[in-house]
Amino acid sequence: MCIFCKIINGEIPAKVVYEDEHVLAFLDINPRNKGHTLVVPKKHYERFDEMPDDELCNFIKGVKKTVEVLKKLGFDGYNIVNNNGRVAGQEVNHVHFHIIPRYEGDGEVVKFGEVKNVDLDEVLKEIKG
């Protein structure tokens, strides 16, 4: 059983900020910023694209409700981050979104790396092929 399933089942304690029948949202134990929260679906799915549409809708609604709760922290903006697969940085194989509140002057910057030289026409051809 994964660590998030253990948290959902109450086997591991967590600082819960929001919960409904579909999602659990709790403070990240290694926060990037004040209020950094993880939102997880209560049903176990490893990747975002594996979730059935109805579960996905409920999950996204839970993410939005979590943001509403976190607004009490008075942040100036926020990042929502989701990694799918090991090479993308996913460390726990249970779908989860990071909500990272942002505060003016906090020094946290989410940037993409070096721009890759990619032929967009070739990529589109491969996708549609």
Curated annotation (Swiss-Prot):
Span(s) of short sequence motif Histidine triad motif: 94-98
Ranges for domain HIT: 3-109
Gene Ontology MF annotations: hydrolase activity
GO cellular component annotations of the record: cytoplasm
Domain of life, source organism: Archaea
UniProt cross-references to InterPro entries, sorted A to Z: HINT, Histidine_triad_CS, Histidine_triad_HIT, HIT-like, HIT-like_sf
Protein name as it appears in the record: Uncharacterized HIT-like protein MJ0866
Native organism taxonomy: Archaea, Methanobacteriati, Methanobacteriota, Methanomada group, Methanococci
